[in-house]
Amino acid sequence: MYKKLIKYLYLSYFFLFSLNIYSNILLDENDKLQSPLPLPYNGITYTEDEINNFIDDTIKNNKRPILIFGANWCPDCRIFSGTMNIPKIKSFINENFNVMYVDVKRYEINMTLLKEFDIPYSEGIPRVLVFDEKRNILNNSNTTEWRTARDRSSQEIFNFFQSMSSIN
C-alpha cells in the first residue's frame, strides 16, 4: 500500500512538474469578436521624436511598446484591433504593453517611420512591432505576420501577445 502511494505521489509530482508554467491563457466561448469593428487609426502624421518618446515612456513604465502600422480601410487591421479589444485579451495587453496605432492611410503617411527601425517597405498591413526594454524589436523577422489577421483565430492573436510579453 505504501509503495503504491509513493508511486502515485511520484507520478502526480512528475505530471505537475512537467506542466508548462507559462502555458497560454485560453479564450472561451464568451471571448468573441464584437461588431462593429473598431476604427483605431486617427490620420495623424507622427515624427520620429514622437515615436521614440512613446517607446521610451512605455519602457519607463515597465511595459513593452507596440507600434501597429495600419489603416481603417484595411479589414485585417480592424479585425486585429477588434481582437485586441476582447476583454480577456485587452486586460492582458493593458497589463503588459502600451499600444500606439500609426495610420499609414493608403501608404501615404508614416511609412518612413518603418525605416527608422530597419523595416523594409512592403505593402500589406497591419505591421506590428513589439519592443523589449532595450528597444530591440522582438518580432523583427515577422512584422508582416498579421497581414492575414482575418484568416487567424482570436486565440492565435492572443497567443502572439502572450509570447511577446515579459512573462515569457
Regions found by a protein language model. Give the residues of each.
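Non-catalytic, surface beta->alpha helical segment in thiol-disulfide oxidoreductase systems
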Residues: 123-168
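Typically the conserved alpha-helix immediately C-terminal to a functionally engaged Cys/Sec
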Residues: 78-92
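N-terminal leader/targeting and pre-domain segments
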Residues: 24-61
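Short active-site neighborhood of thiol/selenol oxidoreductases, capturing the structured segment around
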Residues: 61-74
